[in-house]
């Protein structure tokens, strides 16, 4: 199935946030990519309380690390668009394309500078 967008989370470190994003992705029918490692288990009660039963309705693609995700995106002709405060690009003027993947960094640390320098664009 071809999707207009996908969401990617880089090493999320708050289980309840991951649960809520899975619910959002399920409702919008967006695939969700998760770049590991995770500092918590999917059996964590905070995660389970936030995700409820939506995990069964979300297409989740797990990647063991950034390199695996990056190779996946190249193989599938996806642009990686980083959501960051370190850009002058205006979200509302940005020209998205089909199959873009919007990347969000860790809640507590964002993404490393090497990833900032690797992505296709920033919003």
Task: Tell me what each language-model feature is.
Residues 1-123:
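Post-transcriptional modification and biogenesis factors for structured RNAs
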């Amino acid at each position: 199935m071809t999707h207009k967008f996908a969401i990617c989370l880089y090493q999320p470190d708050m289980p309840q946030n991951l649960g809520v994003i899975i619910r959002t992705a399920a409702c919008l029918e967006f695939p969700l990519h998760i770049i590991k490692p995770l500092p918590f288990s999917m059996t964590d009660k905070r995660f389970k309380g936030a995700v409820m039963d939506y995990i069964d309705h979300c297409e989740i693609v797990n990647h063991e690390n950034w390199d695996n995700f990056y190779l996946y995106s190249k193989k599938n002709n996806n642009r990686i668009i980083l959501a960051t405060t370190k850009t002058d690009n205006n979200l509302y003027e940005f020209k998205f394309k089909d199959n873009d993947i919007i990347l969000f960094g860790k809640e507590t640390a964002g993404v490393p500078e090497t990833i900032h320098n690797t992505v296709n664009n920033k919003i």
